[in-house]
From Swiss-Prot:
This is NADH-ubiquinone oxidoreductase chain 5. Its EC number is 7.1.1.2. GO terms for biological process: ATP synthesis coupled electron transport; electron transport coupled proton transport. It catalyses: a ubiquinone + NADH + 5 H(+)(in) = a ubiquinol + NAD(+) + 4 H(+)(out). Keywords: Electron transport, Membrane, Mitochondrion, Mitochondrion inner membrane, NAD, Respiratory chain, Translocase, Transmembrane, Transmembrane helix, Transport, Ubiquinone. It holds the Pfam family Proton_antipo_M. Core subunit of the mitochondrial membrane respiratory chain NADH dehydrogenase (Complex I) that is believed to belong to the minimal assembly required for catalysis. Complex I functions in the transfer of electrons from NADH to the respiratory chain. The immediate electron acceptor for the enzyme is believed to be ubiquinone. It comes from the Eukaryota. GO terms for cellular component: mitochondrial inner membrane.
C-alpha cells in the first residue's frame, strides 16, 4: 500500500469539509465523485495491508503527546466507500423528501457533518481521536433527531438519545483514561499489550458499545429516535451512529479475544438483544419503529459474533446490513409521504399499484433482511447461523438466536403483507416516483443483491467443501420459512380476531420490557432528591446562618436587652450618685 491511499483518504476528508461550505444542490455530485475516488484503494485490501499515517500534533503536554493519526486497514478502507455511497443515496433522496423544508441547506450540511464524524471514528488510530468522532456522531444525532423541534416528541426523543449515549460515553472515557495512565492510547501499542489489559477498561468498552449500539438495557432510545426525518433514520441506522459501537469492539477486538468473561458478556448481551428486539418488532405497527427494532436485532447479531470471537463475520454483516437497511428506511419514507404522513402499517395497503417501484425495492430489502438465498443478507446471516450452530460455546445463545431469525422473517413478511398486498385502507396522495426517489433506491437495490456475491468472489478464492450436516446447513433457510408462515397467521389474526383480554406478553414486548419506567423513575427521583438537598440543606442553611435570617438571629438578643430599659435616667443617675457618695464617705471616714 503506497502513499496514494492516505492521500486519497485525506482528499476525501478535506473535500467533505469544503462541501459543507457549498450550496446543497452540489452535495450529491460531490459525494458521487468522492465515492468513486474511495474505490481506488480497495485493491490492496486483498493483501491485508495496513498503513498508519501520523500528522500534526493535536495535544502536547509534559506527560503525553497526542498526534492526529489515521490507520488505513481493511475495515477502514472498506467501510469508507460504503459510508460515502449510502450518504450519497440518502442525500439525493433528501432533496425530494425535504424539498419543502426552509432549512434544507442546513439539513444537508448536518448530514455531511454526521458522515465526517463517522469517518473520524473509522480511521482513528488513537483513543482520543476516536472519542472526538464518537462525541461528534452523538451531538449530530441529537441535532438531527430533534430537527422538527416544534414537536414535543421530537425534542424528547433527541434528549433521550443523547442521555442514553452519555451512559455509554462514560465507559469510553473510563477506558481512554485507564489506557492513558497505564499503557498507551495508541491502538497499535494497545494491540501488542493485549495480554495484560485489565478487565475494567474492557467493561468500559462493552458499556460504550451497549449505549451507542442500543443493546439490551439501553435500547429504549432507538425506537424513539424515529421522530426525526426519515433520511436521518436511514443514515443513523445504516452506516453511522448505531454501528459505531459494534465497530469499536471490532477495531479493538485483539484486546478482548483472550478475556473469556468479556466475550461471554458480549455473547449473552447480543443474543438477548437480537431475540428481544425481534420479538418487540412483531408487536409494533409503526413502520419506522419496526425497522428500527430490526436494526437493534441485527446489531445484537453482530454483538453475538463478537462474543464468539468472530469479529470478521460481525463486520461482514455490518456491511451487508447497511445497504438493505438504508433502502428499507427510504422506501418507508416514500410510503409515508404518499399516505399523508401515515406510519401505521394497518392503514396502508395496495401500495404496489400506486408506488410499484418503491414496493419492489421494499420487497427486495425485506428478502435480503430475511436472509433469502443469494441476496447480500444471505451471505452474512447464513454464515453467522452456521457458525453459531457449529459452536460449542453456549447452546442457549444459539437457541434464542434461531428464535430471533424466525421472528425477523415474521415481521419482514408482515410489513410486505400489510403495505403492498390487498386494498388501500386510507386516502392516498399519489406522487410521481421521480429520479430523486428511484435512483438512490435502485443503487441500494443493486448493492443489496450483489454485495454478498462480490464479497464472496473477492475473499474466497477456492470452493470450500461442506462438512456439516444438511440440517445445520439449511437451518437458516428453515427458520426463514417458519417465520414467513407465522407472519401469515399473525396478519390474519390482526385483521379478523379481537383478543378477549389484554395479552401480557404482547404488552411486555410492545413497551420494551418497561425499561422506560425504572429509567425515568430513577432519574426523576434522583433529580428530586438533589433539588431537595440543594434547597433544604444548602440554600436554607446558608440563608439561616449567613443571610438575613442569620443576621436577625444575631442581633435579636441585643434588641431584647435594649427593649427591657424603662428610660428612667434621673432615677438611675440619682442612685448612682448616692451610691458613689456613700462609698466615698465610707472611705474618707476611715
Amino acid at each position: 500500500m503506497n502513499l496514494i491511499t492516505p492521500t486519497i483518504i485525506l482528499t476525501i476528508m478535506l473535500s467533505l469539509m469544503m462541501s459543507i461550505m457549498q450550496p446543497h444542490n452540489n452535495t450529491k455530485n460531490n459525494l458521487m465523485v468522492l465515492f468513486l475516488i474511495s474505490l481506488i484503494p480497495i485493491n490492496p485490501l486483498l493483501n491485508n495491508n495496513e498503513l498508519t499515517l501520523t500528522l500534526t500534533p493535536l495535544i502536547i503536554s509534559p506527560t503525553e503527546n497526542i498526534n492526529i493519526s489515521i490507520t488505513l486497514d481493511t475495515a477502514s478502507l472498506l467501510f469508507t466507500p460504503i459510508a460515502l455511497f449510502i450518504t450519497w443515496s440518502i442525500t439525493e433522496f433528501s432533496l425530494w423528501y425535504m424539498a419543502t423544508d426552509p432549512n434544507i441547506n442546513k439539513f444537508i450540511k448536518y448530514l455531511l457533518t454526521f458522515l465526517i464524524t463517522m469517518l473520524v471514528i473509522i480511521t482513528a488510530n488513537n483513543m482520543y481521536q476516536l472519542f472526538i468522532g464518537w462525541e461528534g456522531v452523538g451531538i449530530m444525532s441529537f441535532l438531527l433527531i430533534g430537527w422538527w423541534h416544534g414537536r414535543q416528541d421530537a425534542n424528547t426523543a433527541a434528549l433521550q438519545a443523547i442521555i442514553y449515549n452519555r451512559i455509554g460515553d462514560i465507559g469510553l472515557i473510563m477506558t481512554t483514561a485507564w489506557m492513558m495512565t497505564t499503557s498507551s492510547i495508541n491502538m497499535q501499542e494497545l494491540m501488542i499489550q493485549h495480554e495484560v489489559v485489565n478487565i475494567i477498561p474492557l467493561l468500559g468498552l462493552v458499556a460504550a458499545a451497549t449505549g451507542k449500539s442500543a443493546q439490551f438495557s439501553l435500547h429504549p432510545w432507538l425506537p424513539s429516535a424515529m421522530e426525526g426525518p426519515t433520511p436521518v433514520s436511514a443514515l443513523l441506522h445504516s452506516s453511522t451512529m448505531v454501528v459505531a459501537g459494534v465497530f469499536l469492539l471490532i477495531r479493538l477486538h485483539p484486546i478482548l479475544h483472550n478475556n473469556k468473561i468479556m466475550l461471554t458478556c458480549c455473547l449473552i448481551l447480543g443474543a438477548t438483544t437480537t431475540m428481544f428486539a425481534a420479538a418487540a418488532a412483531t408487536t409494533y405497527f409503526d413502520i419506522k419503529k419496526i425497522i428500527a427494532l430490526s436494526t437493534t436485532s441485527q446489531l445484537g447479531l453482530m454483538m453475538t459474533m463478537i462474543g464468539l470471537n468472530q469479529p470478521t463475520l460481525a463486520f461482514l454483516h455490518m456491511i451487508t446490513h447497511s445497504f438493505f437497511k438504508a433502502m428499507l428506511f427510504l422506501c418507508s419514507g416514500s410510503y409515508i409521504h404518499n399516505l399523508n404522513n401515515e406510519q401505521d402499517i394497518r392503514m396502508m395497503g395496495g401500495l404496489l399499484k400506486t408506488l410499484p417501484m418503491t414496493s419492489s425495492f421494499l420487497t427486495i430489502a425485506n428478502l435480503s433482511l430475511m436472509g433469502m438465498p443469494f441476496l447480500s443478507g444471505f451471505y452474512s446471516k447464513d454464515t453467522i447461523i452456521e457458525t453459531l450452530a457449529n459452536s460449542y460455546t453456549n447452546s442457549w445463545a444459539i437457541m434464542i438466536t434461531m428464535i430471533a431469525t424466525i421472528l425477523s422473517a415474521c415481521y419482514s413478511t408482515q410489513i410486505m403483507l400489510f403495505t403492498i398486498m390487498e386494498h388501500p385502507r386510507t386516502h392516498h396522495t399519489t406522487h410521481k416516483e421521480t429520479k430523486n426517489i428511484t435512483h438512490p433506491l435502485a443503487r441500494l437495490m443493486l448493492t443489496s443483491i450483489l454485495m454478498g456475491t462480490m464479497t464472496k468472489m473477492s475473499t474466497l478464492q477456492t470452493t470450500t467443501m461442506v462438512t456439516m450436516p444438511k440440517t445445520i446447513k439449511l437451518m437458516a433457510l428453515i427458520s426463514t420459512i417458519i417465520g414467513v408462515l407465522l407472519s401469515k397467521d399473525l396478519t390474519h389474526m390482526t385483521h379478523h380476531m379481537k383478543p378477549k383480554k389484554p395479552n401480557k406478553q404482547n404488552m411486555f414486548f410492545n413497551q420494551l420490557a418497561f425499561f422506560n419506567i425504572p429509567h425515568r423513575t430513577i432519574t426523576i427521583n434522583t433529580l428530586k432528591i438533589s433539588q431537595q438537598t440543594s434547597t433544604e440543606l444548602m440554600d436554607l442553611w446558608t440563608l439561616e446562618v449567613w443571610g438575613p435570617k442569620g443576621l436577625s438571629n444575631t442581633i435579636t438578643n441585643t434588641i431584647h436587652l435594649l427593649t427591657q430599659q424603662k428610660n428612667m435616667i434621673k432615677n438611675y443617675m440619682a442612685i448612682f450618685t448616692m451610691t458613689t457618695m456613700t462609698v466615698l464617705l465610707f472611705i474618707m471616714s476611715k
